[in-house]
Amino acid sequence: MNTQQLAKLRSIVPEMRRVRHIHFVGIGGAGMGGIAEVLANEGYQISGSDLAPNPVTQQLMNLGATIYFNHRPENVRDASVVVVSSAISADNPEIVAAHEARIPVIRRAEMLAELMRFRHGIAIAGTHGKTTTTAMVSSIYAEAGLDPTFVNGGLVKAAGVHARLGHGRYLIAEADESDASFLHLQPMVAIVTNIEADHMDTYQGDFENLKQTFINFLHNLPFYGRAVMCVDDPVIRELLPRVGRQTTTYGFNEDADVRVEDYQQIGPQGHFTLLRQDKEPMRVTLNAPGRHNALNAAAAVAVATEEGIDDEAILRALESFQGTGRRFDFLGEFPLEPVNGKSGTAMLVDDYGHHPTEVDATIKAARAGWPDKNLVMLFQPHRFTRTRDLYDDFANVLTQVDTLLMLEVYPAGEAPIPGADSRSLCRTIRGRGKIDPILVPDPAQVAEMLAPVLTGNDLILVQGAGNIGKIARSLAEIKLKPQTPEEEQHD
């Protein structure tokens, strides 16, 4: 952002002129990095710390940010404010140093709320589908020439970034319920895609507490704001009478205000009709597979229609939608002969879904688009608590694939829980008699253990939220072929 644009911003938020240097602890996370990227483009001095470099930190360094790959007290020196990720503990040396120096320490969502305060905010919340829906809304607004600012939890592939500073009045942001920090946001429009039991440690294990928190989030809307909610979701349907704001519903359900009908999937694309009140039916081609993505698109269309965006711009954006990183992310199709001597090919798809509902949606999309493929899943459970709490749901969903390889649970800082490990989950699935899961004890063995199960007509789903995304990319780079020691030596 040039000096004139920065001056304009600071005239809108005059108190922000006091802030020069913003430091982020845990800056490598997608949500943290996205906000840092917007602020860097607004002209603020950005620094941050994390334990290891990744594409997010590299992008920020390209923008001039100073990144430390350690956590030391001196990193916060001269900072005007410190922004902290929910993954960072209170005894982090930088947090302690900031408190001692009386530097304000705020959560990520508080900074996002400041960015949203003087813009027309559109916040996308819900247990599943937030990232993709945020990208769809952003794509439609960009196609309509509205030049929105967006902050997303995943890579928006069309833009090549998680976040972008626009010069229009709209800020479109993913709203995170995992730590209840979305309560800081005060948007004009809020989408809620669905509500399920997840991140229950934040809500003291009380689902009623989680539901009430979503109601409180919606009541942050002004009385003239709008809640856009998926009426197919039973919890949302239950909560609708308690939402004291204007609402628009969407879904496959017949009483939805924006209704999806005649859905058909052909390969990676969904084709369906959207029925809207007082509008002509809209026949949509969506460049994203699965009924769940048709619902995400319906939410985006509901918001865009309310804003008065013309149908042609909406349709162009959805047909050309490039998706988000690690959401049914097609990494390539590879010949099998170099892998195991068989003729034919294997498709490789990477997906972030780590809740049974998300995994189920991904499997259904794969089956609908490629019904004749041998469906092979490499799955990495994420967190011992989630594996424990949703154990039976995982066991039921994972039996739907033809072949299952499972990595050890990605702990995300948690201690192991007896019976909530991958070996136990494999044993339970095997006992149900549908498939015989293969436990992969070492990620370095994935290519070697994957090769023998491929038939020549395969779709491989690499599924999970831990470090499994790196495994997916490494498989794509070596085209699924296990490397020999000689090849590894020369890399």
From Swiss-Prot:
One CC-aspect GO term: cytoplasm
EC annotation from Swiss-Prot or TrEMBL: 6.3.2.8
Broad enzyme group: ligase
GO MF term list: ATP binding; UDP-N-acetylmuramate-L-alanine ligase activity
The reaction(s) this protein catalyses: UDP-N-acetyl-alpha-D-muramate + L-alanine + ATP = UDP-N-acetyl-alpha-D-muramoyl-L-alanine + ADP + phosphate + H(+)
SUPFAM superfamilies, per database record: MurCD N-terminal domain, MurD-like peptide ligases, catalytic domain, MurD-like peptide ligases, peptide-binding domain
Involved pathway(s): Cell wall biogenesis; peptidoglycan biosynthesis
Residue numbers binding ATP: G126, T127, H128, G129, K130, T131, T132
Gene Ontology BP, a term: cell division
Keyword line: ATP-binding, Cell cycle, Cell division, Cell shape, Cell wall biogenesis/degradation, Cytoplasm, Ligase, Nucleotide-binding, Peptidoglycan synthesis
PANTHER family xrefs: UDP-N-ACETYLMURAMATE--L-ALANINE LIGASE, UDP-N-ACETYLMURAMATE--L-ALANINE LIGASE-RELATED
Record function comment: Cell wall formation.
Family, as annotated: Belongs to the MurCDEF family.
Name of the protein described by the UniProt record: UDP-N-acetylmuramate--L-alanine ligase
Gene that specifies this protein: murC
